[in-house]
């Protein structure tokens, strides 16, 4: 009898457990609780100009007489000394290498940003000049010699660290990041979307790496100490920039 009672109790427990599991799978358990949200940023002092959109840039500069120029590759080499900090905006596309911007790139940026931005809450500003450097070309099938070719088009040189487009207003990074990232991918040099705080943090990290570097064999010390007569194969450009640039390319791992 005791064995029969135990078996009955076990079978009843199994059946009740199965019923509970079936009920729990079909029923939705509702619960209420407290949730803390982040305080939204204050945009009271945000500056909004009368014309918030990017203006049209001329394809050809308004010169009385167009003059041909040499290549002057130093225009895209090394760090930028102008337009490398924010003025009025909070977010920007920053160049991480040197290169030439054509008028087609500028039109692509202008049309993409102007179509997708909200002019009531944000504004965009150019941080580059219109194309001004002439590039010459010769037609196909011409013989060697005969002097420099005719001017074909104009470009704008860009160096590492220069801001291309700046965006500001009553806006957060999540609202404009996808627009600026889409534009940055199409540029002829590596570029990145950064905020004011990100740019300051990047400069601060570079300065901290230089200050707390424990490796005594840095490029700067080796080059300035002329170890093994290294100075005879180094250019003044490499010595001036402590080997952080090879032409238009930036080497972030160098300290």
Report the location of each language-model feature:
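Ribosome-associated RNA-binding proteins
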Residues: 1-255
């Amino acid at each position: 009898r005791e064995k029969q009672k135990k078996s009955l109790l076990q079978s009843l427990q199994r059946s009740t457990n199965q019923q509970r599991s079936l009920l729990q799978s079909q029923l939705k358990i509702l619960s209420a609780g407290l949730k803390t949200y982040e305080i939204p940023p204050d945009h009271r002092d945000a500056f909004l100009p009368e014309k918030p959109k990017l203006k049209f840039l001329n394809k050809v500069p308004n010169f009385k007489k167009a003059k041909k120029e040499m290549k002057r590759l130093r225009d895209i080499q090394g760090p930028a000394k102008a337009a490398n900090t924010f003025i009025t905006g909070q977010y920007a596309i920053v160049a991480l290498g040197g290169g030439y911007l054509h008028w087609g790139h500028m039109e692509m940026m202008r049309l993409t940003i102007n179509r997708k931005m909200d002019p009531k809450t944000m504004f965009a500003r150019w941080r580059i000049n219109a194309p001004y450097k002439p590039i010459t070309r010769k037609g196909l099938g011409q013989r060697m010699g005969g002097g420099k070719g005719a001017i074909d088009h104009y470009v704008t040189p860009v160096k590492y660290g220069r801001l291309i487009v700046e965006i500001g207003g009553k806006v957060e990074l999540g609202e404009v990041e996808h627009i600026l990232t889409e534009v940055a991918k199409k540029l002829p040099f590596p570029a990145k979307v950064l905020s004011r705080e990100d740019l300051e943090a990047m400069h601060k990290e570079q300065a901290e790496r230089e200050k707390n570097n424990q490796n005594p064999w840095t490029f700067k010390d080796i080059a300035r100490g002329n170890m093994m007569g290294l100075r005879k194969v180094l250019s003044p450009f490499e010595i001036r920039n402590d080997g952080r640039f090879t032409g238009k390319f930036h080497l972030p791992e160098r300290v």
